[in-house]
Amino acid sequence: MRPIISDYIQNDKRFQELDDVFGHQNILVTGLSPSAKATIIAEKYLKDQKQMLLITNNLYQADKLETDILQYIDHSEVYKYPVQDIMTEEFSTQSPQLMSERVRTLTALAHNKKGLFIVPLNGLKKWLTPFELWKDHQITLRVGEDIDVDEFLNKLVNMGYRRESVVSHIGEFSLRGGIIDIYPLIGQPVRIELFDTEVDSIRDFDVETQRSNDNIEEVSITTASDYVITDDVIQHLQSELKTAYEATRPKIDKSVRNDLKETYESFKLFETTFFDHQLLRRLVAFMYEQPSTLIDYFAKDAIIVADEYNRIKETEKTLTTEVDDFIQNLIESGNGFIGQSFMQYDGFESLLKDYPVTYFTLFTSTMPVQLQHIIKFSCKPVQQFYGQYDIMRSEFQRYVHNDYHIVVLVETETKVERIQSMLNEMHIPTVTNVQNDIKSGQVVVTEGSLSEGFELPYMQLVVITERELFKTKQKKQRKRTKTLSNAEKIKSYQDLNVGDYVVHVHHGVGRYLGVETLEVGDVHRDYIKLQYKGTDQLFVPVDQMDQVQKYVASEDKSPKLNKLGGSEWKKTKAKVQQSVEDIADELIALYKEREMSVGYQYGEDTAEQSAFEMDFPYELTPDQAKSIDEIKGDMERERPMDRLLCGDVGYGKTEVAVRAAFKAVMEGKQVAFLVPTTILAQQHYETLIERMQDFPVQIELISRFRSTKEVKETKEGLKSGYVDIVVGTHKLLGKDIHYKDLGLLIVDEEQRFGVRHKERIKTMKTNVDVLTLTATPIPRTLHMSMLGVRDLSVIETPPENRFPVQTYVLEQNSNFIKEALERELSRDGQVFYLYNRVQSIYEKREQLQMLMPDANIAVAHGQMTERDLEETMLSFINGEFDILVTTTIIETGVDVPNANTLIIEEADRFGLSQLYQLRGRVGRSSRIGYAYFLHSANKVLTETAEERLQAIKEFTELGSGFKIAMRDLNIRGAGNLLGKQQHGFIDSVGFDLYSQMLEEAVNEKRGIKEEEPDAPEVEMELNLDAYLPAEYIQNEQAKIEIYKKLRKVETEEQLFDIKDELIDRFNDYPVEVERLLEMVEIKIHALHAGVTLIKDKGKQIEVSLSTKATEQMNGEELFKQTQPLGRAMKLGVKENRMHVTLTKSKQWLDNLKFLVRCLEGSMVIEDEN
C-alpha cells in the first residue's frame, strides 16, 4: 500500500510546501482527518529519517494514530511510550506489557536510534531516570570480552532484575558456577558462560526446557524496569524522604501521624540488595537530584509534532488537578509526603521550548506561540456506502469522471480479488499490484488498512477502506509480543515447593519437605523427604519418584495427611476406584451406543461454504482451524457427532459453531442453537444475522423478548422447514417444538441447564449431530484419559487482535475510582463496577452517582426477578447505561464489547479463578481492557487473602496467579465433564492420580492392555556415591527435574542429551554426578539385556538375568565377546536364570559397563514375523 500513496503525496506541491518548514519553524497544519494526518506525518518521517516525537492528548489517541502509522512505517521504527491516562496508576502494580514498550522506547533513544515516537501528554510530563544514568545502564556483551562479574550483577539489580535460583520469568537472573542466565524484558532469555572473567559464550535458551539453543556473538540487555535505582539513588532517596517526612508530620492531623510514620518506616527499610522497583517508583520525586523528562532523551535535531493542541491543554489542566487532589488525599490520610509527585508541573510548551513544533489541528485555532506558517488542507470524509451498491457505483463513477486517483484498501489478498470483481461488475476500471504511479481516473485495489478513508480534493486523491464499503472494523496490526501457551503456563503449577502437599501412590497424602542426601552404609544417595500424620516421615529414593505426585485439588483445599501404615488410604483409593470404574462404564456405553447409531452424513464443503468462510474478517487462529476441521470431519461421518468444543471466553468458539451451522443449512438441514439465558440468545441471534446477511438463510429467535405471535410463526416455520436456524433458551426443548429436519444441535454451556433439560438434550443426541460449547477449560490430562470415548476440541490461543487486560491492584480510593470511571466514559466506553453485597448495592450506586453526576448507572444482582435482570442487562448491552453496579452474576456469559473497564471492590475476598473469569468480561474488543482489583485501605488482610492479592499482582499474562486460576478452573472443568459428585473424589486423591486411575479404568474396559515391558525393572545396588550434590545444583526443583529425566532414559542418545544439558545449565559436573550417569548407562544396557539385578556383594558384583533373557542368550557369542574379562568373570545358570559374577578390581566399574554391553550384544532377537 505504502509506495502507491507515498509516491503520489511526496510529489504533491502542497506537501512539498509543508515539507520545507515542517520541523524547522513553529507551524500550524489544519483540516486533516485522523488517517490523512497519520499519512502526512508518516510521509514526513520516511522522507527525513530522523527522530520524530508525536505528542497526543491521551493513550487512546496515541493507539489510534499508531495503528494508522503502522500501515506506512515498519513497526521496528515505530515506538510508543504508553503511560495510563490516570497518572495515579503509578501507585499500583505495573503491567509488564506497557513497561516493556516504555523500556523499548527509552532504550532506542539512549542508543540515538531514528524512529517515530508516539507519546501521550502524561508520558511527556512523567519524571524519569536522568538520561546519562539510563544510558550508563545499557548493557551490550560480546563473546571474548572481560567483565567484572560483581559489578555486572549489581548493575542488573539496579536495572530492576531479581535474582533467582532458576530463571523462569521476565526480569529474573541467576548465577550458577560460571553461568549467568538472564530473562530480559525485551528479547530472548540468554545464557552467558564465563571462563574466569571472560565471556566464553552467549546462547539464547528456552525457559521451559532450560536448554540453550543458538550461539550468538553479542547481546543487548535492556533494563527490567523503566527506572534505574543505584546505591547512590537509594542514599539520596533516604535523605530526601527524611526531609519530606519531617516537613509533612507537623502539617497533618494528629490522628494520622502514626500512619505516616508507618508509611515512612516501610520505605526506609529498603536497601539496594532487596527493594521493589514497583513500590519505589512512588517516590520518584525524591530519587534523583535532577530527574529528566522524556524530551531530555531526544536528539537536538528531532522533529516535534503536537496533535490537537487544545485537547492537549485541556488534558494537562485535568491531569494537574487530578494529581494534586490525589497527592493531597495521600498526605491527609498519612500515606504520602509533601513534595511527592511523579510528574513535572511546567506547562507543556515550556518542555518543548528548545524545539520548533508542528501543530496539527482539525480547525484553525489561536495558539500561544508565535507561528511562522499556517498551512490549510482541505480534506473530506468518504461517503459511508455500507454495502449500498447503487450509491457505491455512482460515487465511484464520479471519482473516475473527475480524474481522481482512487485507492481502495482491503485487509486480505483474497478480498482484493473479490472487491476487484465486484467493481468490475459495476463497470468501474480497476487494477491491482501497482507499485507506484497511480493514473488518474483509475481505481487501484490493494492490501492495506486505515481507521477510515479520506478525500483530498486539491490533490484529486481519495482513499477508501472496507469500513466505508461494508461497515467492517479495522484490524489492528499488533506488534509481536512474547506469549506462552496455556499448556506452558499451567505446566509450572506442577513445580514442587517445600511445604506442598503430595500424593504417594501407596502411602497417600503427605507433605513434601525437600530433597535430602543421606548416607546409608557408607554410600551417599538423594531421597525425597515426606511428612505424614503425626511425626511419621518417609524417605523415597529418587529413582522411585514417579510414585510421588503433587497434590492438586480445588482452590484453598487443604487435605488431611494420611498415617503411614494405616488402612485409611487403601479405603480412600478403593472408593475412588469404584467411582472411576462407574464413569468408565457409563462413557463406554455411551460411546458404543453412538458408534452404532446412524445419522446424516454430510458431503464435502460446497462453494457457498468457501465463500461464507472467506467473508470472515479475521484470521483464524491455528486452534480454531483445527477445531473446524475436526467438527467437519465428524459431520462427514455416518455416526452422529457428539463433540465438546472448549475455549476461553472470547477465543472464537462462536465462529467455529457458526461455520458448522452454515454447513448443515447448505445441505437442507435445520439447526437449533440452545443457550442458557435470554441475553445470550439475543447476542448469538444477532451474531448469526450479521454473519449470514449475504446468504439465503432464515434465522429466528425463541425467547421472552419475542411476542407470542412471533414465537408461534417461528414454531410453524420450524415445522414447515421455512426456518433454517433457531436460537433460543430451554424453550427450544419444549414438547411443542417440532422440526421438519433437524440436523445439528449446538448447546452453549450445557452445565448451566437443569437436570430435566439435560435429560431432554440427551434424548435429542441419539440421531442428530451435537456440538457443545464451554468456556471452562478441560484439563489436558483428563482430555488424554478420555481419548477415544469423548470427542474434545480445544482452543487455547487467543485471537491476534486481543490485547492482554491491563491489571492493577491498589487500595480503595474514591479519587482513583472517579478517574478510572471518567477515563472509560471519555472514550465512550462502559464500566462494570463489581460490588458483591446485595444489601447495600443501591447505596453504592448512590455514592457512585455523586462521584459521576452525569453518568447513567444501573444495578444488577441475583435477587432481582429474572425479567428485571435480563432487561437491565440488555439495556446495558445496548449502551443505555454507562456503569453497571453488579454482583458476581456477570461472571459468565455476558458479552459487552464496549465495556472495557472492570472495578472490583474487596478483591481480596474472591477466589483467584473467580477473579480470572470476571476479568475475562473486559478487553473483548480490539480496545485495551482495564481491571482494577481494590482492597480496603489500612485493612489487616488474612494470610490467604494476602497470598491471593500477591498472586493477582502477578495476574498478568505470565504470572503465577494465572496458573492457580487455571488449575482451579481445570478442576471445575473436570467436574462439569464428569459430574459434580466427582469433586469429592478428585479432592480425596488429588487430580493427577484421579486422572491416571480414570485412564486405566477406561483402557481396561475397552480391552486396551498396557504393554508389558519385555524386561522387569533393573534393581541396582552398587556401593557408589552417585547423586546430584547440592553444591552442583542448588535449586531443588531443578534437581528433581533432572532425576525425573534420568529415570526415563532408555537410549545412550538420551543420556548424551542429559549430559549436554547438565554442562549447558550447571557447568562441568563433579565425580558424584559422573558416577550417577555411569549407573544410568549401565542400566540402559542391562534393561535391553533382560538383567533384573546388579548387586554389590563386597568382593564381587552379581548380575542376574530373567528367565526369558536366559533363553534368548547366545552363550557362544557371550564367551567370545567377554574374553577380555578373562577369569574376572564367572557364569552359571540356576533355576533357569543366568547369573554372572564379576570379581571386583580397580577398574570394576569399567568392567561392569563392558559386561552389560556384551550381554546386550549376545541376545538372540526373535524374528517378529
UniProtKB/Swiss-Prot annotation:
Pfam families per the UniProt record, alphabetical: CarD_TRCF_RID, DEAD, Helicase_C, MFD_D3, TRCF, UvrB_inter
GO BP of this protein: regulation of DNA-templated transcription; transcription-coupled nucleotide-excision repair, DNA damage recognition
Residue span(s) of domain Helicase ATP-binding: 634-795
UniProt domain Helicase C-terminal: residue ranges: 809-970
Keyword rRNA-binding among UniProt keywords: no
GO MF annotation list: ATP binding; damaged DNA binding; DNA helicase activity; hydrolase activity
Ranges spanned by the short sequence motif DEEQ box, renumbered to the chain: 748-751
Localisation: Cytoplasm
Keywords annotated in UniProt: ATP-binding, Cytoplasm, DNA damage, DNA repair, DNA-binding, Helicase, Hydrolase, Nucleotide-binding
E.C. numbers: 3.6.4.-
Protein name: Transcription-repair-coupling factor
Species: Staphylococcus haemolyticus (strain JCSC1435)
